[in-house]
Amino acid sequence: MTKIQNVKLALLIAVTASFLVTSMTGGAQNEDKNMVMEAGSICEGYAGQTPRDIDSKTGTNPVVFELAPPASDMNLCNIHFHKNAEHKAEAFSIYAGDGKDGYDSGYQCGISENLTAAELAAPAGDICKGLETGDTIEVHWVHTSCDVAPGPGLGSCLSDACANPDLRVETQVFTLVNDSNALDFNDLSYSNNQVNGFHQAKALPENTGLPVEFMGSTTGPSYSEQICSPLQVTWSVRPQCAKLDINTIGKWCESNVFEEDHAHGVRALVTDERLLSPIE
């Protein structure tokens, strides 16, 4: 293994350790003064950061990397979700507030303001440790170029033989409703299914607009415009919200190979153009 590969592996191990706690929040908050800039400035030398307003194509970050292959040509390695949308778009632009430590922040779907009483009816029992009807969630289907099986955290996207993979995140924002006619999360989850030799979700959301694809990073509240994520990720974010039956994601939270049972916090929206890659 070369010296560069050793550095990459050490970096990925550090990020993986944090991911197992907060899932895709990445980061080891490096205290190296060269990496963490003074308050008010931005971190430098990194590729474009995520999340972003996908309706804006503007970005001046000069770091370029090759986009990951289509999800169908990669292995699904993790599924997790965040309370409120990390990204912003016209369809999910209602600001949830500043929150604390990544919780009670982010963006909500516009359709969440026009739900019926039946859709807002409380489900029986606890859902994923606190989800309620009317809530917005952003689901991430994480894919890797490594030959691995799905499992908990970013560690499942790596292996000893594949320490620097291509990563792709397919993304959908949902409004939770108590309606069996809404989308069933079981239809979008993973159940040991493979297609053409690749681990795949049963399906990915359709009919929610053409996904916006761009170069970005891992997300989550451990990162900010002063503390950048070092991992390079190809993002594919659908621009429209969809209604999801809250009972079905509640069932998924009870048992899944990813050991996910709750919503994760969000990273503050990245707005400085120097930290954003241009969207083609």
Describe every region a protein language model picked out.
Residues 48-148:
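Short N-terminal edge-element motif at the start of the domain
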Residues 29-32, 212-280:
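Long, compositionally biased interface segments
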Residues 145-222:
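Short helix-loop boundary/capping segments
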Residues 2-11:
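Bacterial N-terminal signal peptides that target proteins for export
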Residues 27-42:
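Intrinsically disordered, low-structural-confidence terminal and linker regions
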Residues 70-75, 80, 161-164, 180, ...:
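Non-catalytic macromolecular-recognition regions in eukaryotic signaling proteins
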